[in-house]
Design a protein with these regions (language model features):
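Alpha-helical transmembrane segments in inner-membrane proteins
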Residues: 1-344
Length: 344
């Protein structure tokens, strides 16, 4: 009972941090709007609640800044952080590798190649209000998932190592193709690199809804199957001896998580270390039960990336840093410490 209270307390603290972080993120920017004002303006956009919030003291421009610029960006950063963090936690169990992250199967490389083609060749396509780069990135990511499964994961007895090696090989191939394309189109290299380093500057409500729906479905599947992750973490032979169809569950989880990563990367670019760092911190706080780790990773990942994005758009204002740079600054030292601890 005491442990349950402790875990509940940690969840409440994490949720409170997420809320406070969101309020601060909404209030920070070139236009000065206080925290209370930002919260009021954000609440005014919620159907059924907005009519009870007095925002008469705020200008039309301030309402637009909060509701159409900052709020979609804050929510999108939180959603992508939650998705990448949960994906990293699942992959670390599936591949029995504490250094596994959401990009381990080459999904991000596929998305990056799709985005590169869209940028360099001026492809014009839009689906449900999502622009060319996002659509092409998502298509590239989905095609990568299909390739990985066709080559390394379709057979019933396919081993994890086969899927992993296939993903690594495809990722290397796509990276080489990207390098070739960029070497032939020098004038647009900067735009490609900026996308690859991650940014939420193009956040709009359509992207928020799209990612939210994808994540809701995928995370529900992951949470339902989280009890099997606990058994798989003990080793494949142990799980099989307990009657768990590890191959089937692994295939489902890899597919679902990869689709979630594809949705995240298509709207944000390639952002590293979120799915590597946060699951380990959450595991330290909540133990090794993945029924507790996944909700914690969702909250922790959302908070971490939201704060990193806030720093990215304010540290060098009116300019903006790629958010992937900040996540790498935080994540790389942690990765070094993790490797050092494993070697010891």
């Amino acid at each position: 009972m005491e442990k349950k209270k402790t875990y509940l307390y940690i969840y409440v603290c994490m949720a409170a941090l997420l809320f406070v972080g969101a309020a601060i993120s909404l209030s920070v920017g070139s236009a000065e709007i206080g925290i209370i004002g930002s919260i009021k303006l954000a609440l005014s956009g919620i159907p059924g609640i907005g009519q009870f919030v007095d925002i008469s003291a705020y200008s039309t421009m301030q309402r637009y800044i909060i509701l159409q610029v900052r709020l979609p960006r804050v929510l999108l950063a939180a959603l992508v952080g939650a998705g990448l963090s949960a994906a990293g936690g699942v992959f670390q169990v599936i591949f029995q590798n504490p250094l596994a992250d959401p990009h381990i199967l080459g999904v991000s490389s596929g998305a990056a190649l799709g985005a590169t083609i869209a940028i360099l060749f001026g492809v014009q396509v839009s689906v449900l209000g999502i622009g060319t780069i996002g659509v092409c990135a998502f298509i590239g990511a989905i095609l990568t998932i299909m390739l990985v499964y066709l080559i390394g994961g379709m057979k019933k007895g396919a081993k994890t190592i086969g899927i992993l090696l296939t993903g690594t090989a495809i990722s290397t191939l796509f990276s080489a193709v990207m390098s070739l394309l960029m070497s032939l189109n020098h004038d647009k290299i900067e735009q490609v690199y900026l996308w690859m380093m991650g940014s939420f500057s193009a956040a709009v409500w359509v992207k928020v809804c799209y990612v939210a729906i994808c994540e809701m479905v995928c995370l529900c599947v992951c949470i339902v199957l989280s009890k099997y992750l606990n058994l798989m973490a003990m080793g494949e032979e142990t799980a099989q001896s307990l009657g768990i169809e590890t191959a089937r569950i692994r295939r489902i989880l890899i597919l679902v998580v990869s689709v979630m990563v594809a949705a995240c990367v298509s709207v944000s670019g390639v952002i590293g270390f979120v799915g590597l760092v946060i699951p380990h911190i959450v595991r330290f706080l909540l133990g090794d039960d993945y029924r507790r780790i996944l909700p914690g990773a969702i909250l922790g990942g959302g908070f971490f990336l939201m704060i990193c994005d806030t720093l990215a758009r304010t540290v060098t204002a009116p300019g903006e840093l790629p958010v992937g740079v900040l996540t790498a600054i935080v994540g790389a030292p942690y990765l070094i410490l993790l490797i050092k601890r494993k070697l010891a």
